[in-house]
Amino acid sequence: MITQEEILKHLDVDYSYRLAKRMEVYKSNPVLGYRTAGSRAEFETGEMLKQEMESIGLSDVSKDAVTVDGWEFKKAVLRFEGQDGREREVQLGAYQTTLVTDGFEECSLMYLGKGTDRDYEGKNAAGKLVLVDINQRDEWWINYPVYEAHLKGARALIAVQSGGYGEIGEEALNAQDIAGPEDAPAFSISERDARELKKLLQEKGELSVFLDADTRVRRNCTTYNITGRIPGRHPERMVLLSAHYDSYFSGFQDDNTAVAMMLGIARALVASGFQPNNTIVFCAMAAEEWGVADSNFDWSAGAYEQVFTAHPEWVGRVIADLNFELPALAHGTRARIRSCYEYVDYLNEWLEDLPNLTQAYPEETKVTAPIETWSDDFSMAIAGIPSMVNDFTGGSFMETHYHSQFDNDEFYDEQVNRLHHELFALLIEALDRTAVVPLCFERVMKRAARSLDEELGELWVSPEVAVRLEEMKQLFEQAAEFSWREYEEVREINNRYSSLLSQGREAQAEELFQRERKREAELLRRFKLEQDEFVRIDWYGNVYYLHELCMEKIRLLGGAVKNLREGKISAALRKLYQVDNNAYAFMFSEEVYRHFTEYVLDQPKDRLKWGYQRLAGHENLYPLVTGLLQREFGGESDCRKEADALDEALSRQLRALLDALDTLEKITKKDFIQR
């Protein structure tokens, strides 16, 4: 039996670093990089990774074909005459849209503030390039001003970051998923270059510039997820490791180092002679950054297709997905594993028994939950595969270097990289000594109960609804108690199994393993059921439970009704700003608002991917919001008509809440409480 020390001894972070650097060779844009969904650069990187998997000794190395929308960004250069009279050429970043010029083409450029509907008043943008400021972290995503420009007839929009992302320096370009249609072209420009253009535009109003661009989106392309295996004694039971190999710019941290770490761990396991009980699968995912045109859920396309289309049989067989993102830089003061709730207790217990590992952080490693929609582990989880990821959202990197040309090895932290190698290599070894997937639903039920403690307000919730909420709280608490007792049984089984393996009593261990197949299948079935029925997202991709979203809208709508009946329009508007996607009603035209609402509600599953049926409805408040803004501007305070309209919306949400509780009650009683 291979020991933890043997596995750790064979880890080689220098190998992983070199592999991460090798991935930088493949690029669509010779100046900026980019290795995007369906591009030649992504394909060539996949071919290299396939060869690498074979060379380190993985078995059954294969290319799993998946269909995504493709994007090839070859160039975008802006030429203009500077203030000193000298010709300037600047590199532009790009978003996943289509615009191909015939060499340098002359265009008129105008500056339009933040690119909101109001910024176009009295302006003619038809056929022109529009320069705007944007803060995608604190204000709105790029698709809103881009589509506004498109509707106003602009040839393309050029965005400069005014905060939120790319804060490392004034030369930074930024890239994100566009979440909009491909026929509304968009580019990014550095703060330094935009500042010079703004000075010229202050003098002239409009400026003649020349654009040379080649950026193309093609729908329904084939790309490949690359998989390799270390076969186990139980081929039907798998542990999955995943990381994505597409990137913006050179993508050293996001996500070259993650792919390299995954293969570095694979290489160490093979070299150590580790012979697993479970089959260990290593999957380099394509099309994580973007892969679906004109969709609000346009990222994580490759992972979604891998488990929903290419290998749906993985569900019920894969006991854990260990996903990796940006593992070679320091995120805050400690390493964190971001996990689905069901794995938290197991991970906490496992961390307590770990040997001393590399001291890369001043504080000890912790587990946090739940997983988020930012990475491929969410697609895995909603398919029914329990998942986790090294947490990558702490620290300043996301605001400074993330998705810019400064994502390079200058931020590389060898000690952090080594710690993550050690941590997840040993987690694979620990999971290999389980007979039953160590899931615990207690935290799921405790969160469901805890959210029912929050006050909804006496003015708009009847006594009957209050009684219903208390009944459901007690039911969830009862389910939490049962879930913990069930987990204690699973923990005892796994401890016994691990002990038998350590003693070399493999026959008895195998007998125990086979006896528990039904128990594991049932736990995985219920995990998928819970993901299907409990887990939802709001209009910004944040993870909630179904009833939580209804309750939040009830609080906001009820509060707004109260404010309006008191003549407090500003207070009401602040609440309505938070309802669904109605924040965009304050700044953008109704056609923009309608497009980005309907494309979430009305597109088929293959366009919505992991967001399909994950939202809890929508309240269209556009006419009401714009009307209230006019009343506020005009100094009016009589808003009884608007209050009555919101009362109707409030009633709809109360009905939706009761329906949600009915659904969750049936599932909880049937599947999460001992019968």
Name each model-derived stretch.
Residues 318-319, 326-447, 451:
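Active-site-adjacent substrate-binding region
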Residues 137-144, 148, 222-225, 247-342:
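Acidic/histidine-rich catalytic neighborhood of metal-dependent amide-processing enzymes
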Residues 278, 397-450, 574, 585, ...:
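His/Asp/Glu-rich mid-to-C-terminal helical/loop segments that flank catalytic regions of hydrolases
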Residues 2-11, 30-40, 111, 133-139, ...:
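Second-shell loop/turn segments in exported
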Residues 12, 37, 90-185, 363-366:
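Extracellular/luminal Protease-associated
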Residues 410-505:
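Charged, amphipathic alpha-helical linkers/stalks
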Residues 6, 11-14, 18-21, 25-129:
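Noncatalytic luminal/extracellular "stalk/propeptide" segments of secretory-pathway proteins
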Residues 2-4, 89-122, 175-253, 263-275:
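Soluble metallo-hydrolase cores and metallopeptidase-like ectodomains found primarily
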